[in-house]
């Protein structure tokens, strides 16, 4: 997989932990990087590539991760990278073709507290929304 370089938003664009109304450090830690490898002869290899990388969110105490499904479809290897740099292999547990979401089960202990699932129905006009990707720091 390609090496990632450390980049960050300028300080004025970063959220202030004391002002967001939730545990920002916990939210950042619950977002992991997923890297996957798909065989060259895979059905989706030509259109989606054989090396894929994206984000996932830990949603259960056992480390279960929800992600976008294309990252894991046909994957023969998955690596999970935590915010503190640990790398654990993962197993593609499920892919839902209707929603496009996938589930990855780590094959080792992540030691990350899961995020609590919310409801989009509770989000209103003018509410603040935060988009968090792997690598954020509080």
Model-derived regions, located:
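N-terminal targeting leaders that route proteins to membranes or the secretory/organellar pathways
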Residues: 1-30, 51, 64
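N-terminal post-signal-peptidase region of extra-cytosolic proteins
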Residues: 13-18, 43-45, 49, 112-115
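A short, Trp-centered hydrophobic/proline-enriched beta-strand micro-motif
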Residues: 26-47, 131
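Generic structural motif recognizing short loop/turn segments at the entrances and edges of beta-strands
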Residues: 5, 28-32, 48-49, 54, ...
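Conserved active-site neighborhood of the chymotrypsin/trypsin-like protease fold
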Residues: 10, 39-41, 53, 60-138
């Amino acid at each position: 997989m390609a090496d990632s370089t450390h980049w960050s938003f300028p300080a004025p664009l970063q959220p202030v932990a004391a002002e967001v109304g939730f545990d920002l450090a916990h939210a950042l830690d619950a977002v992991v990087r997923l890297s996957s490898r798909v065989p060259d002869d895979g059905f989706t290899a030509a259109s989606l590539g054989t090396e894929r990388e994206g984000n996932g969110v830990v949603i259960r105490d056992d480390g279960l991760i929800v992600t976008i499904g294309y990252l894991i479809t046909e994957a023969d290897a998955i690596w999970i990278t935590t915010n503190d740099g640990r790398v654990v292999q993962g197993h593609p547990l499920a892919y839902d073709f209707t929603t496009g979401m996938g589930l990855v089960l780590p094959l080792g202990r992540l030691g990350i507290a899961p995020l609590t699932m919310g409801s989009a129905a509770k989000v209103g006009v003018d509410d603040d929304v935060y988009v968090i990707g792997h690598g954020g720091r509080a």
